[in-house]
Every structure is written in C-alpha cells, then in structure tokens.
A protein has these predicted regions:
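Pre-Walker A adenine-sensing motif
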Residues: 2-16
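Hydrophobic anchor at the beta1->P-loop junction of P-loop NTPases
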Residues: 23
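Conserved lysine of the Walker
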Residues: 31
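Hydrophobic positions on the alpha1 helix immediately C-terminal to the Walker A/P-loop
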Residues: 34, 38
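Short glycine-rich substrate-engagement loop in P-loop NTPases that contacts/grips substrate
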Residues: 53-82
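Interdomain motor-coupling "hinge/lid" segment immediately C-terminal to the ATP-binding subdomain
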Residues: 119, 123-228
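Accessory nucleic acid-recognition modules appended to NTPase machines
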Residues: 182-341
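Catalytic cores of nucleic-acid endonucleases
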Residues: 324, 348-394
C-alpha cells in the first residue's frame, strides 16, 4: 500500500473518541485502502488483531444481510473486557446500518469506522441518524502531491510543471496510478468507475427509467466545467436540441449526481453584499479524467480542468469554496477555512496585456488583506503584482503556504 498520510493522520486524531468516524467520497477514491492503513496504524500502537473487526459489505458474502443479523454478528464478535475497533466498508449496502452503529456505540466499548459512496453518506443525511455522534472525512482522488508519490513507485517523475499535464489528463483515481497505463487504458478504467456510479449509485438506487435523459444532463455538466449555469440553462439547451426536460427534473438529476460524489456544487458569493447567491452556480467534477473518459480528450478544455484541479485541492485542504462576484467581475475561487481566506484566479495562459490587467484588477478591487493569487500554467507564472502572488498551477498545488 502507498501511504496517504494526510487522511490517515487526520483520522487518527479521533481514535477512541466517542464518535463514529465516517469516510465518504466517490467510488474508488481510496476509502477502503485508507481503512486498511488505519488498521495497520492501530496494530503499530499495540492493538491486537483479535480486537479489530473488518468487514467489506460490497462482497457477495454479505449479500442480503439484514441490520438485525449485522447487529448480532458484531455483538458476538465484540470483546467483553476491552475496546473493540470495528471497520465497516461500504456500509450503506446494509439497510438500517445506522441503528446498528448507534446501538453499539451506546451499549458497547467500541470505536467504529465506516465508509460509503452514495447519498446516504452525505453529511446532510448522516446528521439525521447519527445526530452529533460522528465526524466525517471526505476522501478525494489523489492530489497532485499524492500523484507524484504514486508515480515514484514505478518511474522517475519529471519536474512538477512537466508532470502537471499528465496529472490533469489522467486524473487522480489511485487505481490508474498503480502502474504505467496508457491514456486509453486509464480512460477505460475511469469510464468503468463512471458507469458504476451512474448505474449503481444513481439509476438503480433512484429507480430512474429514462437513463438517456440523465446522461444528457451529465454530458452538459461535464462539458461546462468552469461555466456558471442553472437547471433552467440545461432545460433550455435540451429543448433547443429537441430533447424536452423540465427544470425540476434537471435539478433533481444534478442533486443525485452531487449525492453520488460525481460532481461538486460551487455557489456564487457576492463579496459586496456578503451573501451566497442561489442562481447560476458552477459544478466541478470529482476528477478531471472523468471528463476525458466520458467525452474524449480535448486540449481546449485544459484551462477548465486546471480550474477543476485547483478547486479540488482547496476542498482537500478543508476550505469551503465559492465563486466570487464583484462589481469588477468574477473571482474564480473565494476559499474560506475558519478565520482564513484566500482569493484565486486561474488561467492556463495569459496572452494579452488587457487580459492580464483584467485578472489583476478583479483582485485589486477586493479591499482586504487576505492572500490573493493569480495562477497560470505558462512560462510567466511567477512574481508579485501589487501584493498579488503570481504562481504556476503546479507550484500552487504543492505549496504549503495556504
């Protein structure tokens, strides 16, 4: 196993706390492997194997298992005289699992860790049945730093700036970077992940009959990363293509895609009025490779995928991210974490002086002292302009400054 210490260390801080540790995120982002890493960390701390229970519920072994049977199975295995550590992988496969977990937490000396990949594991859903007795960790596909670590297992990476293009193109699903796959092979793997999410986590669970309608919404969303739009925008577009779909249905599909962790909603924030806006949101993909695996590679979309990668990195680091609205124009990202804030503009390259001035003017229009960045992917990505930090996207993704 290739370590992912960012997640493991964050979760280990809550070992033995009276909280269920919940790992969420898109399928194949590495949740199951992180559970195994946590188990190894507990063993290094001296916890014997017999006090560690590990179950993976997407296995046929547990097909048809009821909540009552799960409770009896775990109760019989729990140690009577010492704390037992319980790991439940893809626990959403068991209807009523939350009652089992609640009962064990209340009545037994246990420390419980669970993972899940669909809407029942969203924070908004978990809070309804674990009522304050949990702490959640969203697991994302590999960061750029993790991608470089994985690649070092089978090759010598080029410079980070040179590697960025490959990272954007192949994405960060861990399985893609266990060996040197070709782009075609990598996209086959990613497309299979996409199909599993669409047909298992969305179509089957929600009993969607008109799959073609759902896929049209998916393709529109994937094609418009970095653009603001709404359910009404998609509905009007499909109508122009002679594919009628009402706004309410489009909104419901977007919500289901979000709950399956396939896309992330990024609301607009009015920096002058200091309020979140409810219209014309942006949506970013769980991984850049999803766009290329589903729609094919297009070099004209690299700028949007760079923006997508920056969004994901900010989210990995615990920032709440929104799109900034100012009188001078749009700020790609307003990122907030407790008392910290930063502003980020992302551009693949800036070829005209007027474009460069516009990027800086939007940030200079913000009258506060929080860090402001213009990120580029060309040879001029360095320096400082009136306090605005100019960085290469690759350097920003690896930076410890935020």
């Amino acid at each position: 196993m290739i370590e992912r210490p960012t997640y493991v260390n964050a979760i280990l801080r809550f070992v033995d706390a009276p909280l269920v540790k919940v790992l969420t995120g898109i399928r194949r982002s590495g949740k199951s492997t992180i559970l195994l890493m946590l188990i190894e960390a507990l063993k290094r701390r001296g916890i014997p194997s017999e006090r560690i229970l590990n179950y993976r519920f997407d296995s046929m072994r547990y097909d048809g298992l009821t909540a009552n049977a799960l409770y009896e199975m775990l109760l019989a295995a729990v140690a009577r005289d010492q704390k037992t550590y319980i790991f439940l992988d893809e626990v959403q496969e068991i209807a009523g699992w939350e009652k089992v977990v609640n009962s064990l937490m209340q009545d037994e000396d246990v420390d419980i860790y669970v993972t899940g990949s669909n809407s029942r594991m969203m924070a908004s859903e978990i809070s309804t049945y674990l009522t304050g007795r949990y702490v959640s960790f969203e697991v994302f596909p590999l960061s750029f730093a993790e991608y470089l670590t994985f690649k070092r297992q089978y090759a010598i990476p080029q410079s980070p700036r040179a590697e960025l293009a490959q990272y954007i193109r192949l994405g960060g699903f861990p399985v893609v970077h266990l060996q040197p796959y070709t782009s075609d092979d990598a996209y086959t793997i990613v497309h299979d992940i996409y199909n599993t999410v669409i047909f298992t986590d969305i179509v089957r669970r929600n009993e969607i009959r008109k799959v073609d309608q759902l896929e049209r919404v998916v393709k529109y969303t994937f094609s418009n990363v970095g653009n603001t739009f709404s359910a009404a925008t998609i509905s009007k577009y499909l109508k122009s293509e002679h594919r009628s779909l009402d706004e309410e249905t489009v909104y419901a599909y977007l919500e289901k895609l979000e709950k399956a962790f396939l896309i992330h909603r990024c609301s607009r924030y009015d920096l002058k009025g200091k309020e979140l806006l409810k219209t014309q949101e942006k949506f970013y993909l769980a991984d850049p490779a999803l766009r290329y695996a589903v729609l094919g590679y297009d070099p004209d979309t690299v700028a949007a995928m760079l923006e997508n990668a920056v969004y994901l990195e900010l989210r990995r680091r615990g920032y709440a991210v929104s799109v900034g609205k100012t009188p001078a124009g749009e700020i790609n990202f307003v990122a907030t974490r407790q008392n910290d804030r930063l502003y980020v503009q992302v551009a693949e390259k800036i070829e005209q002086a007027s474009t460069e001035k516009r990027e800086f003017d939007r940030l200079l229009d913000i009258r506060d002292n929080y860090p402001k960045y213009v990120l580029r992917a060309d040879d001029f990505a360095h320096g400082n302009h009136e306090g605005i930090i100019v960085m290469h996207v690759a350097d920003f993704l690896l930076s410890d400054a935020y």
